[in-house]
Amino acid sequence: MEQKMTNNHITIGILAHVDAGKTTLSEAMLYSTGQIRSLGRVDHQDAYLDNDAQERERGITIFSKQARLDISCGTNAADTARTADVARTADTARTWHVVMLDTPGHVDFSAEMERTLQVLDYAILVISATDGVQGHTRTLWRLLKHYNVPTFIFVNKMDMQGTDAEKVQAELRSELSDGCVDFSSQDLFEELAMCSEPLLDEFMESGEL
């Protein structure tokens, strides 16, 4: 697939099987980047992107939606939220302009979801730690591979009782790809830190990247 990313503008899509927590993640991203002032919830029928009456009544995403996030490099999420207005006028070399596409998770609306894949630079595939890899998850993975979309896997609900990070990681490797790596592991941080001096400085200071 031809690379669509230009300069500091990227398009990402959020995909998931139903009830994986995709809308919750979208709300958190919008809130942490200062695009919304309060977190909406599906069960409260006030999620920012699920603004269609049918979506709010049924508690699912039916239509693909988009939102723009301005993310300033070198700041954490809290700083970005507090300085959202400044970020919009900051030096563009230090700000990523992200178009986020929220897609339907229900299998009945797969055609609506698939239409977005051809315009993505990256995808975030949300998986519930309590449900694991579902049939629809495998379908999404195959489609992302077909359209050659680089994909980050976000494992949601890891704070739920009975979840096991090692078990989830093993399932991702066996069901999706043995190339799935845990970006929170200490070994990975150490390996990445050796790739550049700024990363090494950050790792030595905070122990994370």
Residue ranges and their predicted role:
Residues 1-20, 39, 75, 93-95, ...:
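P-loop NTPase catalytic nucleotide-binding module
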Residues 2-79, 91-127, 133, 174-176, ...:
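P-loop NTPase switch module centered on the Walker A-proximal segment
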Residues 81-86:
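Intrinsically disordered, low-complexity tandem-repeat regions enriched in Proline and Serine
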